[in-house]
Amino acid sequence: MKQPEKNVLEVKNLSVSFHSTAGEVQAVRDVSFSLKKGEVLAIVGESGCGKSVLCKSIMKLLPRSAQIKSGKILLNGTDITDYKEKEMQKIRGSAFSMIFQDPMTSLNPTIKIGQQIAEAILVHHPKKSREEVYNLSLIHI
């Protein structure tokens, strides 16, 4: 009997709020989903509904005025909800990454995408040669 595939990413009851002089504003309320290897998830909604806040919460890239109020973020079964910045730097770009909504600030249009992916891999695997990493990026490894 085949083992059920484990979730690569699981978000459980995630709620995120922003603190301002006017008080607390809830931007993400009780969101849950899970993704297995090879699955794709589309997050759609009106402008300002919390899509970017949700994704930035998962990546732990929220501004200081924001706080994860409740819920869990599991990456390959490991709870990363309370990871500090140093721990996140080790997994961002290697275990998962994000291309932000504004492609002009995310991808450099004058550099081939393969080279940009290779740069991210080199940050996490400095012992690999630039050529080796570039070739791996071309075949999506």
Regions found by a protein language model. Name each.
Residues 2-8, 17-30, 37, 61-67, ...:
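A short, flexible loop at the N-terminus of ABC-type nucleotide-binding domains that lies
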Residues 10, 32-34, 74:
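ABC ATPase nucleotide-binding domain
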Residues 49, 66, 98, 103-115:
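Conserved catalytic motifs of ABC-family nucleotide-binding domains
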Residues 49, 139-141:
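Conserved small/polar residues in nucleotide/adenosyl-binding loops
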Residues 59, 74, 104, 110-123, ...:
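Short helical segment in ABC ATPase nucleotide-binding domains corresponding to the A-loop/adjacent helical element
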Residues 67-79:
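Conserved ABC transporter NBD signature motif
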Residues 80-97, 123, 130:
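ABC ATPase NBD coupling module
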